[in-house]
Amino acid sequence: MMDRRSFLKDSAGMAAAAGAVPAVARAQPGGAYDVAVVGAGAFGGWIALVLRERGLKVLSIDEYGPANPRASSAGETRSIRSGYGAQAIYSSWAATALKMWKLRQAEFGRTILYPNDRIELANAWSPSMLAQRKIFDDLKIPYEVLDQAALRVRYPQMNFDDVSFAFIEKSSAAVIKARESMIVVSEVFQKKGGAFRIARAVPGAATGRHMTTLKLNDGTEVAAGQVVFACGPWSAKMFPKLMGRKVDVYRSEYYYWGVPAGDDRFSWPKQPAWHDHIVGGYGFGSIERGLKYSPAALGRVAQDPDTAERLATDYLLKRGRDYIGHRFPDMRDAPILETRVCQIEATADDHFVIDTHPDYDNVWLASGGGGHGFKHGPLVGEYVADRLMGKATDPETDKLFRLASRPDLQPTGAGAA
Ligand SMILES: Cc1cc2nc3c(=O)[nH]c(=O)nc-3n(C[C@H](O)[C@H](O)[C@H](O)COP(=O)(O)OP(=O)(O)OC[C@H]3O[C@@H](n4cnc5c(N)ncnc54)[C@H](O)[C@@H]3O)c2cc1C
């Protein structure tokens, strides 16, 4: 693996060849960092850790702290799945990321991963599901297809009266403790010599196409050779002109139902994760907090990640109760024990934005996780570190994640065009 000395030497070489001295190649004056990463969520947290592990001097900054309750990475749990319809890149990324999470779990020495079946309930093979089945065949990812009768035998706690079949992911799916794992990532980052600060950061001074400092809300400035903005749902607030028409930030709610006493049918590992292509929504078996279900929202409600109240919406609570009673008859009268309101930061085509800032050669943008970015954290960390350190990456992936490749969109709640 490239260490800091050889990286600086190589970068200087590359820079000399390119006739410019990239930021990190310049020995950082005094207390300057090689890299400052703004945002300690699933994207920024992993980017900072991987860069630190590669020997760089890294500062991780978050205005509210890692996995803070406003952040999209702060949910108790998130799902890891390889089922992505026709989007093969995310199927293979998810399969790789799952392997990385398993290694990290061993390193962290605590249980954060809960492997389970993931069932997609359907009545017809949509083009997206047909494409997914082919991708699973091509990537040799194991799966099963069970009809209604077989589903009733395998998962008797669920009602399949309106379901013809299910596509079942076997070894490529898991539930991950999201909030907990992001706190561990930040702890391990600091244990490995990374610096962490709670502060709101904005772009600071610049010389030509080189941003030299970040300005912090306490009036101080920090210098860094390179800067990564991994601000998730705050990216459009940070760069309104650049990101304002590229990402949409809207609410997403889910709730936890209390399982019956002494009854483990609705809990991991007996209860699989599921995605309902018929009624809508998805959920996981209980891991500590209850049976989780997120009803389909039937439309987007814009959300300001700083100021929005995280209180559940009545009509979605009703949709959730009706659904649980339908899909889990023995849970019809179960109490809702907890509710969560989070925000999704999605691009028009649901692809990530990982690219340099158009005005600065040493500034990186890493966001656009949408409703699916958490699982990819470890791989996003490696990928961005490779890009930032000038290591070869897949040009097709680079192109896919380019900011300019994202279609413009009309953000939810924004005034009519
Ligand atoms: C309800 C819901 C369910 C989801 N389910 C899944 C799932 O099952 N599987 C999956 O893989 N993904 C899922 N996702 C998506 C996933 O959670 C996100 O894609 C991912 O967490 C995004 O991480 P992030 O680091 O980009 O953003 P965040 O986690 O929001 O992190 C951004 C951080 O930047 C900080 N920040 C912002 N601006 C500044 C600033 N100026 N200065 C300092 N700090 C700043 C914030 O405090 C925040 O901590 C879900 C998302 C939601 C909302």
Predicted regions and their residues:
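N-terminal secretory signal peptides and thylakoid transit peptides that target proteins
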Residues: 1-15
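Core beta-strand elements of the Rossmann-like FAD/NAD(P) dinucleotide-binding domain
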Residues: 33, 217-226
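N-terminal Rossmann-like FAD-binding beta1-loop-alpha1 element of flavoenzymes
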Residues: 35-59
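Dinucleotide-binding Rossmann-like beta1-alpha1 core, especially the glycine-rich loop
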Residues: 77-154, 280-281
